[in-house]
Amino acid sequence: MLRYLTAGESHGPALITIVEGLPAGLAVEAGYVDRQLARRQGGYGRGKRMAIEQDRVRILSGVRGGLTLGSPVCLQIENRDWENWSTTMAPGPEADTGDRVVTRPRPGHADLAGVLKYGHKDVRNVLERASARETAARVAAGSLARRLLEELGVEILGLVVRIGPVQARIPEVPLDALRARIAESRVMCPDPYAGLSMVEEIDRARDDGDSLGGVFELHAFGVPPGLGSYVQWDRRLDGRLAGALMSIQAVKGVEIGLGFEGAAQRGSEVQDEIFHNGEKGFYRTSNRAGGIEGGVSNGQPVVVRVAMKPIPTLRRPLASVDLVSLTPSEAAFERSDICAVPAACVIGEAVLAFELARACLEKFGGDSMTELLDNHRRYLERIRANRAGG
């Protein structure tokens, strides 16, 4: 089974990712992962931390000569900011645990719940791990999954459709043109007019000492029918995707296809009618289901929208209580972003890629890429024969 674990604190020496279950023979290079990490660091509205970090991955195991070995792959991303925190965050007894103590939990963060759960006195012991800095490790893991999906003909595309009150209109243009517009935008928005308004809204939030959330949309093209299953609740593809995406820091909602919009419509307006001809086989003229029916991919693009709440760390702090004195106080302030929706979109791409890669490996199997690709090819041949009425 494909899985990963991450480790590391926000201001610790490094982030570590261990990916287990990749087949042998997958072409992997550090530069590919680095490009995804650089995308995560971009986007208008990021904080000063991104000016310090220049995320680069170091492959420590599981790859030789540019090809995976089938053994666990260990990835390391150094934290350049560690040199400014080495005394505070040292793992040994030399750590100055009285330095940079945080006792005023921030509303909306894991701060208070974390100290209550684990019995910490210093909120720093919570926020260092709960920080979205951890998502750099997830993007590294997702990059390997993305490489595997590319070999299977699956492409992932993410775009921002909303920041704060500004809603984008997605242009009906060819995929290459859409991809180019996203790349040109400072907020990953293919609507240039909405993109400018989003930047202005971020500037206003910065001036007000506030933050902004938004919505991003993920598309997976080339997903074969048959991923996931309806036979048990925990094997349904839509449930697995939603659960994985909801685990991203600050994400508060996930919808697939029409999502909540479909709840206000009649059944005849929501379902995707089925057609057939000798050339196409089975086909649809709409994709309101977002590529998943009954917990199983149906061969259409998988479409998911993800809602991210505004970042809780505010330059004009909200009310809190000091954990030591139990007196009213302003919440602590830690260096943070104004808006991280574009970065979250890149993280969402990685998370989606990993879950789809996991589903592909479960469906097709194979300890090597040769075996996986052969199984995948034979399955698609059978599907095409069925579509043609064979």
UniProtKB/Swiss-Prot annotation:
Any Pfam family: Chorismate_synt
Cofactor note: Reduced FMN (FMNH(2)).
E.C. number: 4.2.3.5
EC class of the enzyme, as a word: lyase
Domain of life assignment: Bacteria
Cofactor requirements of the protein: FMNH2
Gene3D superfamilies: Chorismate synthase AroC (3.60.150.10)
Residues annotated for FMN binding in this entry: R129, A130, S131, Q249, A250, G294, K309, P310, I311, P312, T313, R335
UniProt keyword annotations, A-Z: Amino-acid biosynthesis, Aromatic amino acid biosynthesis, FAD, Flavoprotein, FMN, Lyase, NADP
Binding site for NADP(+): R40, R46
Annotated S-S bridges: none
Gene Ontology cellular-component annotations: cytosol
Catalytic activity from the UniProt record: 5-O-(1-carboxyvinyl)-3-phosphoshikimate = chorismate + phosphate
Amino-acid biosynthesis found in the keyword field: yes
Molecular-function GO terms, alphabetical: chorismate synthase activity; FMN binding
GO biological-process terms attached to the record: amino acid biosynthetic process; aromatic amino acid family biosynthetic process; chorismate biosynthetic process
SUPFAM superfamilies cross-referenced by the UniProt entry: Chorismate synthase, AroC
Pathway: Metabolic intermediate biosynthesis; chorismate biosynthesis; chorismate from D-erythrose 4-phosphate and phosphoenolpyruvate: step 7/7
Complexes and interactors: Homotetramer.
Family from the record: Belongs to the chorismate synthase family.
Function as written in the Swiss-Prot or TrEMBL entry: This reaction introduces a second double bond into the aromatic ring system.
Name recorded for this polypeptide: Chorismate synthase
Organism: Desulforudis audaxviator (strain MP104C)
